[in-house]
Amino acid sequence: MIILVRLDYEGDDLQNDLKKMSEINSKIESKIGGKIEGPFFPQQSTLLFIFHVDKYERLNEAGRTFYAEMAKLKLPFVPDTYEVAVTPEEFFG
């Protein structure tokens, strides 16, 4: 299962803030498991991250940790949208 997280950026030092975001992503990967890819620079928003998780429970936990850590560090990323995508096996069981 993947989660596509799109964020906008309202700061003035994207490169430095991305380093901090990388630390958050590493923390999530070690605490929750799975893998986070990105950042990507999509057409619709400033940034795109792709979260790979193996269980539905991890989906909410990864998201809560991601947004809580961003708020704690006062990073100027603003949530745009997120989308969950599953494989047929995950959907049908």
What does each model-identified segment do?
Residues M1-R64, L75-G93:
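Short S/T/G/P-rich N-terminal loop/turn motif that feeds into the first structured element of a domain
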